[in-house]
Amino acid sequence: MTTTLQQRSRASVWDRFCEWITSTENRIYIGWFGVLMIPTLLAATACFVIAFIAAPPVDIDGIREPVAGSLIYGNNIISGAVVPSSNAIGLHFYPIWEAASLDEWLYNGGPYQLVIFHFLLGCACYLGRQWELSYRLGMRPWICVAYSAPLASATAVFLIYPIGQGSFSDGMPLGISGTFNFMIVFQAEHNILLHPFHMLGVAGVFGGSLFSAMHGSLVTSSLVRETTETESQNYGYKFGQEEETYNIVAAHGYFGRLIFQYASFNNSRSLHFFLAAWPVVGIWFTALGVSTMAFNLNGFNFNQSVIDSQGRVIATWADVINRANLGMEVMHERNAHNFPLDLAAGEVAPVALTAPAING
């Protein structure tokens, strides 16, 4: 009797690595996009934390007046930020090896570029990873489409806007008060509140919040009773159950009578598509608006648009907003220019809309 032993061919290390990377059985899916996403997001996070805590002041305006943003230099969680790279650097790519020393790199705000480039690349890979996992599970690709809205917004404020303005010093600072400063200056220079695409974004965000609250409250109010009065309603649902957990007919009837019939969805699929599409489209438009304002295609200008029969200006709310814009423009970067161009180029503007009567 003879026995034949057949040696099993072993898969190569690369084949086993590929199988592990693309396996949907892992607790957390990695995927090929994840191979790039993980190191880039780790690098961005590590640099952000270190810079937020200990980075030295940055010469953001390029006029040798450094601005401190880290905790060690006296800031707190609210006032602290990773300060954008210097206006002296402009749009130049500024990695560590381009600086003469590490001190120079820190002084010119090099950490800001390191963080935003790795962050944007990592977020883009996260979007690709969403698509990749959906593809491998046989799902439709709309999750990554929805995620493209916040990714477009981040790309607009961190990359497109600095490119349009000619310097990464105009990018959004990485901090709470820095974000507010960016918003105020953006309004002063571009009148974003009167830009139609920003208005669509406001409708998308606030409308999405409203619709989410309406949907959640309607579903919670029309749950199918599966528990007693002494048990939590949440015990009435078992993960993976085939039965509906709420009565969509009851919810449809309630909302249809509360407003009118056709204001209520009678199709669960179209309802949830609407809940996803409304805020996503709104945020898309805002990102597009910021990207156009980056190249100074600004919001509407209704300044001094109402005049009387003798040609005198009748002040409107648009003129009040314009005064606020001018004030904000004067206050920011106050040492970087001799006189704000918006004020120097226009006619003399009185401080008050009407001169007060002084009885002395």
Swiss-Prot record:
Keywords, comma-separated and alphabetical: Calcium, Chlorophyll, Chromophore, Electron transport, Herbicide resistance, Iron, Magnesium, Manganese, Membrane, Metal-binding, Oxidoreductase, Photosynthesis, Photosystem II, Thylakoid, Transmembrane, Transmembrane helix, Transport
Molecular function per GO: chlorophyll binding; electron transporter, transferring electrons within the cyclic electron transport pathway of photosynthesis activity; iron ion binding; oxidoreductase activity, acting on diphenols and related substances as donors, oxygen as acceptor; oxygen evolving activity
Pfam families: Photo_RC (PF00124)
Binding sites annotated in the UniProt record for [CaMn4O5] cluster: D170, E189, H332, E333, D342, A344
Localization terms from the record: Cellular thylakoid membrane
InterPro entries, sorted: D1/D2, Photo_II_D1/D2_sf, Photo_RC_L/M, Photo_RC_L/M_CS, PSII_D1
Its EC number(s): 1.10.3.9
Catalytic activity: 2 a plastoquinone + 4 hnu + 2 H2O = 2 a plastoquinol + O2
Translocase as UniProt keyword: no
CDD domains documented for this protein: Photosystem-II_D1
PANTHER family associated with the record: PHOTOSYSTEM II D2 PROTEIN, PHOTOSYSTEM II PROTEIN D1
Purpose: Photosystem II (PSII) is a light-driven water:plastoquinone oxidoreductase that uses light energy to abstract electrons from H(2)O, generating O(2) and a proton gradient subsequently used for ATP formation. It consists of a core antenna complex that captures photons, and an electron transfer chain that converts photonic excitation into a charge separation. The D1/D2 (PsbA/PsbD) reaction center heterodimer binds P680, the primary electron donor of PSII as well as several subsequent electron acceptors.
Name of this chain's protein: Photosystem II protein D1
Native source species: Microchaete diplosiphon
